């Protein structure tokens, strides 16, 4: 990809925009950065660019700048359907994501992981497996480290593991991972997409440029994902918790079995620190993607056994009066909450709600009816969730997250579980899911009595 001397527009600042701008400037591009936020809101990021000779257009998007650019690189937080981008595309300007830009300069084989839920856990675990095998690995993408940072670092790694959101996949053209993983697809981000099908189509682009020399690792327990097997050009490697596979990776009676080209490997889930039905899927996907990439089976198994998981994902906080409190603030959509509820039997007090993302809460109905003893709702979405689920169990509404914890403490009995799994984003009441998690954890730790960890 030729960059020197080109007029390149970076849309959206934040961490990814900064990394892209610095890379482009280092390669001799004429860089302009545009963001709808004002200078005062972007002060921390602007400090990281003050040594560069570039143009800034803040608080607005100038359509003329879009039309005069040779290349437009869009940060993940910017919708691809804003009018300046649509106009630029209509005028045949090249519009790509940071992922597409970075991949053009990376020679190492790549494992790319997407799905509605489980991406970060699977990506992190795959990276840990490669590292346990002595493979120098870059782990990044939607997980927090922009892929372009690998290019700017100059590090010659042997392997790349990248987490991809639907937003990042919207802007690819030639991006081609050696192993592409699709974990699941459920309704999400319908506040950004015109339809559910548009969201699905964005996810499926991960396979777009693969060939028969590549692998598609597919969760065949998910009907939407399983259907991909008939359309992808790469070799399909399935994984399942529900059925035995002649070739692929599956879990039966607590044993994960990996079968490929006549060989068979077994991993006992009893030895794993990472618990939860949904995490078995994540583990199988991580094992499949790394073993297909040449990871040592024994070292891979040891890496899985020692992996404890990530914060804010079904994290045990403490026990109070015999009631176990779990924080799952990363459960920002209905599909994720389904998996979390499936990890417990009856007697759940569920705290949910936040900023509505546009999807239906109906998929939670059976689990709420069968397993949720008390439902406590917060945030902008509480009225809508109550309308869809409130008649299925004992339901309460709370003004704040702290109030919700207090209500849960009053209602839950010894031997039961309080689960905070919102099914919504956090932006109505909090900066992000991490701040929301810390507020919940602080409220739980403030409860009198119990075992605090």
From Swiss-Prot:
List locations, semicolon-separated.
Cytoplasm
Which SUPFAM superfamilies does the record cross-reference, listed alphabetically?
MurCD N-terminal domain (SSF51984), MurD-like peptide ligases, catalytic domain (SSF53623), MurD-like peptide ligases, peptide-binding domain (SSF53244)
* UniProt GO molecular function: ATP binding; UDP-N-acetylmuramoylalanine-D-glutamate ligase activity
Query: Is this entry keyworded Flavoprotein?
Result: no
Question: Where does the chain bind ATP?
Answer: 115-121
Q: In which pathway does it act?
A: Cell wall biogenesis; peptidoglycan biosynthesis
Determine the domain of life of the protein's source: Bacteria
In terms of Gene3D superfamilies, this protein maps to: Mur ligase, C-terminal domain, Mur-like, catalytic domain, NAD(P)-binding Rossmann-like Domain
User: In the UniProt record, which is one GO cellular component term?
Assistant: cytoplasm
Q: Which reaction does it catalyse?
A: UDP-N-acetyl-alpha-D-muramoyl-L-alanine + D-glutamate + ATP = UDP-N-acetyl-alpha-D-muramoyl-L-alanyl-D-glutamate + ADP + phosphate + H(+)
Q: What EC number(s) does this enzyme carry?
A: 6.3.2.9
UniProtKB keywords? ATP-binding, Cell cycle, Cell division, Cell shape, Cell wall biogenesis/degradation, Cytoplasm, Ligase, Nucleotide-binding, Peptidoglycan synthesis
Can you supply a Gene Ontology BP term from the record? cell division
Q: Please list every transmembrane segment annotated in the UniProt record, as residue ranges.
A: none
UniProt keyword Cytoplasm, yes or no: yes
Indicate the principal place this protein occupies in or around the cell.
cytoplasm
What is the documented function of this protein?
Cell wall formation. Catalyzes the addition of glutamate to the nucleotide precursor UDP-N-acetylmuramoyl-L-alanine (UMA).
Family to which this protein belongs? Belongs to the MurCDEF family.
**What is the protein name stated in its UniProt record?**
UDP-N-acetylmuramoylalanine--D-glutamate ligase
Origin species: Geotalea daltonii (strain DSM 22248 / JCM 15807 / FRC-32)
Which gene name does the record give? murD
